[in-house]
Amino acid sequence: MQPLVGIIMGSTSDWETMKHACDILDELNVPYEKKVVSAHRTPDFMFEYAETARERGIKVIIAGAGGAAHLPGMTAAKTTLPVIGVPVQSKALNGMDSLLSIVQMPGGVPVATTSIGKAGAVNAGLLAAQILSAFDEDLARKLDERRENTKQTVLESSDQLV
């Protein structure tokens, strides 16, 4: 299947976090591609990836990065596709540096920013699916079912309080 979501990350060390976005897309049967695209080590490749994403059929890009975390913003600067930034937790500042770098974009270059780490990657996968579901009723139904299942799990969790 043609990938609809591009998942990019600054290095392989970001995979521990970013795989959770892939898990969500797998669960919802949304096709995606995943690549290491470094804003600092492979800037030309990053520009090419962003500039050609639309013509390759990509509809949403999820970009995960830690530290300076320039990947989401620089990707957004080179495409008008929706870009979702995932701050990867860093050792130095627990991901706060990544979060602030991604969320503080100048007006005119939006990046939808999620929370730090695993929860952020999960939410990025869900947000990408929700964006696509605006044009895909089957995907919208799957998201509704997932939300209902989550609700039931929470309601049933009270039974564990013994």
UniProtKB/Swiss-Prot annotation:
Keyword vocabulary terms for this entry: Isomerase, Purine biosynthesis
GO biological process, one term: 'de novo' IMP biosynthetic process
InterPro entries in UniProt: PurE_ClassI, PurE_dom, PurE_prokaryotes
PANTHER family referenced in this protein's UniProt entry, alphabetically: PHOSPHORIBOSYLAMINOIMIDAZOLE CARBOXYLASE (PTHR23046:SF2), PHOSPHORIBOSYLAMINOIMIDAZOLE CARBOXYLASE CATALYTIC SUBUNIT (PTHR23046)
Catalysed reactions listed for this entry: 5-carboxyamino-1-(5-phospho-D-ribosyl)imidazole + H(+) = 5-amino-1-(5-phospho-D-ribosyl)imidazole-4-carboxylate
Record's function text: Catalyzes the conversion of N5-carboxyaminoimidazole ribonucleotide (N5-CAIR) to 4-carboxy-5-aminoimidazole ribonucleotide (CAIR).
Species: Bacillus subtilis (strain 168)
Protein origin, superkingdom: Bacteria
The protein's name: N5-carboxyaminoimidazole ribonucleotide mutase
Entry EC number(s): 5.4.99.18
Entry GO MF terms: 5-(carboxyamino)imidazole ribonucleotide mutase activity
Record's signal peptide: none
Amino acids binding substrate: S11, D14, R41
Protein family according to the UniProt entry: Belongs to the AIR carboxylase family. Class I subfamily.
Biochemical pathway: Purine metabolism; IMP biosynthesis via de novo pathway; 5-amino-1-(5-phospho-D-ribosyl)imidazole-4-carboxylate from 5-amino-1-(5-phospho-D-ribosyl)imidazole (N5-CAIR route): step 2/2
